[in-house]
A protein has these predicted regions:
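A short alpha-helical cap/connector motif
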Residues: 1-119, 129-170
Length: 170
């Protein structure tokens, strides 16, 4: 026993989860992501802390709704990186990118997914881990979705384009 009163077992307890943390860090940096499309998103969107686009209208709209600065920057950079022209927040309309904030209840997410799939739009669901009900719905969306999904713990990206069925949890 150490002078602190903690046994060796108590001091090494955190090592139990080390492998999953290392794997997440590895994927977050883009290593182990075998899709060039998603790898570019990880490197050019998730790892950037400053705005890369000249137009920052999505950034301003998300900040106005109380979304964290880092998430606003990432989503604005995603819109610029993917070349999306139009976007919508919490409404189903003809655009390239739809963002569902916490204002969209978990039981209303499935109509957004169906609309995005029908119109081949990209859907972003913010805070998929906020509560158990929201996560259950998001997990079902990922399981049934025919294309690529990217979950970076802050939001879930549901792509409806040329990509094959792949699930990335970063």
């Amino acid at each position: 026993m150490k002078k602190s009163g903690r046994t060796l077992k108590a001091r090494l307890y955190g090592l139990k989860h080390l492998s999953s943390r290392l794997k997440r860090a590895r994927h977050f940096r883009g290593h182990g992501v075998h899709s060039p499309y998603v790898y570019n998103i990880v490197r050019k969107v998730f790892m950037q802390r400053e705005l890369l686009a000249e137009r920052c209208d999505l950034y301003a709209a998300l900040k106005e709704r109380g979304i964290a600065e880092r998430r606003c920057v990432q989503l604005q950079n995603l819109v610029a990186h993917c070349g999306y022209e139009a976007w919508g927040i919490d409404r189903m309309e003809e655009c390239d990118f739809i963002v569902c904030t916490m204002a969209t209840a978990y039981d209303h997410l499935q109509p957004y997914v169906d609309y995005a799939r029908e119109h081949r739009l990209t859907l972003c669901i913010l805070d998929p881990y906020n509560n158990a009900n929201r996560w259950e719905v998001c997990r079902g969306i990922v399981e049934r979705h025919p294309s690529t999904t990217v979950d970076n713990r802050a939001y879930l990206l549901v792509f409806n384009n040329h990509l094959p069925k792949q699930v990335f949890v970063l």
